[in-house]
Structures are given as C-alpha cells and as structure tokens.
C-alpha cells in the first residue's frame, strides 16, 4: 500500500486529508513574479544604456551645426600626421574641402573613414556621381573607371537600429550604400549640395564641411552624362588629416 508522509507519520492513501491552505503558495508565486519583473526591467535598462538595443548617439543641435558649416577657410588648418577629426580633401583644378568628422554621432563610420584616409585610399579617386542641388559622390572609383573596394561598415542610422540624429542638410557628409543592404557602406561618400531630408534615417551622416562649400558647388555644377557621371573627371588628389590653427 502506498503511503504519504505527514507530520504524524504515515497516512493511508484512503485516509481523509485535511484541506490545504494555498494562501502562502499564492503569495510566494506572486512575490517571485514581481521579483522577476523588476529584474527584467533592470537588465533592459542596463542593456539600453550600453547600446545593446538601440545605440544613442550624441544629441545634436542642428542650428549650431548649420552655423559651423562653411564658417572657416582651408587656410585655418594645417596638415598633420596624427589621426584627427578634421580631413582636408584636395580636388584637382577645384580647390580644397575641409571636413569635420563626428565620432560622437557615428563612431564606426568615422573610424572606417579615418582608416581609409590614413591608408591614402582616396588619392586619385574621382567624384563619379554628381547631381546639382542634391549631392556629389565619390571615393570608390579611379579615373579609369576601375572600382576600388574596401571593408564594409554597419549602417549607423535609425532605419538600421541606430540613433543617428545628424540631418542631411546642405554641407553634411554621409556614406553611400546599396539600396537593399543597410550594412554595405564602405568607401564611397557623398556631400550634400542641398538639404535632402528624404535621406534622414536611411544613410549614415557622419560629419560636415567646415570650409570649401564653393568647391562642392562648383563640382555639383559640372556637365554630366545620363548616369550623372561628369564628362571630365573630377579627381581627388589626396585626403589628409588637418588640425585647426586656432
């Protein structure tokens, strides 16, 4: 005969059992549930703070940035061998464009761009796609039309789960990519010749022009073919790091 344990020794299976009080059991499970809920909330908060879900870029004051765009000249900067947040692009027959990079907004994008500049990747590349009142795009092809590849980088923009709040206003630099692949940006960049709000959230803006918007405008005005390629090559002679003199 099977038996059960009780406080008074064995009890027969068919013996009348006292009715159990489940109050303490219910309270215990409610307490456990509340504890698990609180712990889950804490974990989520911690992971959100470290960028595990939707990374938070630096807050951006677009009015301040607009006031910075094209506020200086190339003569306000000096070349340096150090990796900095300032890059000067020299365009043959056109002049110089000085960029300020913003790693606080798009860190991986800036890191990739700095790596390419340091390697001399942009020397003798062209602006191969030019659309006036929109943008100038380059960095991936040389004058012969040969495409040069580079490592891809995760797309740091909101459509790809990253909180990039730098808007595509005139003078902003951003990464080109394949339309169907958010993580396909590599070496091709574009500079906005006009505000292009339809790009916000879908492309990784990572800096802006501090000097040389007249150069950008001159390039944007060149004659192009049906594929938006300039008839005459617009050649990037070099891209180097610079430091402000003041």
Predicted features and spans:
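Cyclophilin-like peptidyl-prolyl cis-trans isomerases
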Residues: 2-246
């Amino acid at each position: 005969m099977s038996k059960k344990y009780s406080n008074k020794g064995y009890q027969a299976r068919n013996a009348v059992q006292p009715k159990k009080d489940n109050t303490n059991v219910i309270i215990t499970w409610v307490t456990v549930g509340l504890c698990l809920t609180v712990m889950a909330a804490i974990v989520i908060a911690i992971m959100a703070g470290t960028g595990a879900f939707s990374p938070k870029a630096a807050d951006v004051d677009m009015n301040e940035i607009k006031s910075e765009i094209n506020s200086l000249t190339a003569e306000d900067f000096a070349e340096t061998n150090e990796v900095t947040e300032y890059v000067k692009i020299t365009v043959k027959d056109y002049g110089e464009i000085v960029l300020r990079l913003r790693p606080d907004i798009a860190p991986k994008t800036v890191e990739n761009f700095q790596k390419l500049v340091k390697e001399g990747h942009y020397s003798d590349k062209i602006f191969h796609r030019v659309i006036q009142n929109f943008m100038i795009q380059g960095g991936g092809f040389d004058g012969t039309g040969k495409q040069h590849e580079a490592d891809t980088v995760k797309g740091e923009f909101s459509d790809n789960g990253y909180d990039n709040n730098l808007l595509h206003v005139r003078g902003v630099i951003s990464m080109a990519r394949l339309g169907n692949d958010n993580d396909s940006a590599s070496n091709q960049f574009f500079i906005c010749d006009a505000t292009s709000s339809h790009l916000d959230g879908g492309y990784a803006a990572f800096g802006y022009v501090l000097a040389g918007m007249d150069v950008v405008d001159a390039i944007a005005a060149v004659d192009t073919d049906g594929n938006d390629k300039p008839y005459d090559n617009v050649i990037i002679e070099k891209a180097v790091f610079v430091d402000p003199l003041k």
